[in-house]
Amino acid sequence: MGLETEKADVQLFMDDDSYSHHSGLEYADPEKFADSGQDRDPLWLNSHLKLGFEDVIAEPVTTHSFDKVWICSHALFEISKYVMYKFLTVFLAIPLAFLAGILFATLSCLHIWIIMPFVKTCLMVLPSVQTIWKSVTDAIISPLCMSIGRSFSSVSLQLSQD
């Protein structure tokens, strides 16, 4: 729009009168949740997803659309992002949480009952393997490398200028 220089936080507020209470369900007061300070991402795992309209759509100074177009597109962006996120979480959050739980349970089970016993077994066997490897190295590989080294150390190279 060109007139605003700071990012704006867009929020959608609805009065209690606009809710339909005919179903008998009681809706929570949105101000209670806003004041409770409940952070669902305390470790900032998804801080990269906190994008605003200005982070996605930007008009250079030389090309500005009409202010009303900019305001409407900003509002539609925020509302569609909000509505689509809510819509997708209604249908995907529970099945994906279920699948993630199954995946993490499977990986935990494999780690606890297969991988760690295998690693501990390897660590138990390694001292004897280390002893055998040291014996093979001392008996076969070390003399072979020493003889090759002595053979090459006796080679001398002389350069003559012709």
From Swiss-Prot:
Membrane topology: Peripheral membrane protein
Ranges of the Cytoplasmic topological domain: 1-86, 108-162
Secretion signal span: none
Modification after translation: Phosphorylated on serine and tyrosine residues. CAV1 promotes phosphorylation on Ser-23 which then targets the complex to the plasma membrane, lipid rafts and caveolae. Phosphorylation on Ser-36 appears to modulate mitosis in endothelial cells. Phosphorylation on both Tyr-19 and Tyr-27 is required for insulin-induced 'Ser-727' phosphorylation of STAT3 and its activation. Phosphorylation on Tyr-19 is required for insulin-induced phosphorylation of MAPK1 and DNA binding of STAT3. Tyrosine phosphorylation is induced by both EGF and insulin (By. similarity).
Transmembrane segments: none
InterPro entries named in the record: Caveolin, Caveolin_CS
GO cellular component terms given for this protein: caveola; cytoplasmic vesicle; focal adhesion; Golgi membrane; nucleus; perinuclear region of cytoplasm; plasma membrane raft; sarcolemma
Record note on quaternary structure: Monomer or homodimer. Interacts with CAV1; the interaction forms a stable heterooligomeric complex that is required for targeting to lipid rafts and for caveolae formation. Tyrosine phosphorylated forms do not form heterooligomers with the Tyr-19-phosphorylated form existing as a monomer or dimer, and the Tyr-27-form as a monomer only. Interacts (tyrosine phosphorylated form) with the SH2 domain-containing proteins, RASA1, NCK1 and SRC. Interacts (tyrosine phosphorylated form) with INSR, the interaction (Tyr-27-phosphorylated form) is increased on insulin stimulation.
Chief subcellular location: nucleus
Record flagged with keyword Nucleus: yes
Protein name stated in the entry: Caveolin-2
Localization per Swiss-Prot or TrEMBL: Nucleus; Cytoplasm; Golgi apparatus membrane; Cell membrane
Any single biological process term in GO: regulation of cytosolic calcium ion concentration
Species the sequence originates in: Ateles geoffroyi (Black-handed spider monkey)
Keywords from the UniProt entry: Cell membrane, Cytoplasm, Golgi apparatus, Membrane, Nucleus, Phosphoprotein
Family (UniProt): Belongs to the caveolin family.
Intramembrane segments: 87-107
Modified residues (Phosphoserine): 20, 23, 36
Function (record text): May act as a scaffolding protein within caveolar membranes. Interacts directly with G-protein alpha subunits and can functionally regulate their activity. Acts as an accessory protein in conjunction with CAV1 in targeting to lipid rafts and driving caveolae formation. The Ser-36 phosphorylated form has a role in modulating mitosis in endothelial cells. Positive regulator of cellular mitogenesis of the MAPK signaling pathway. Required for the insulin-stimulated nuclear translocation and activation of MAPK1 and STAT3, and the subsequent regulation of cell cycle progression.
Gene Ontology molecular function: any one: molecular adaptor activity
Phosphotyrosine found at: 19, 27
Keyword presence, Membrane: yes
Superkingdom classification of source: Eukaryota
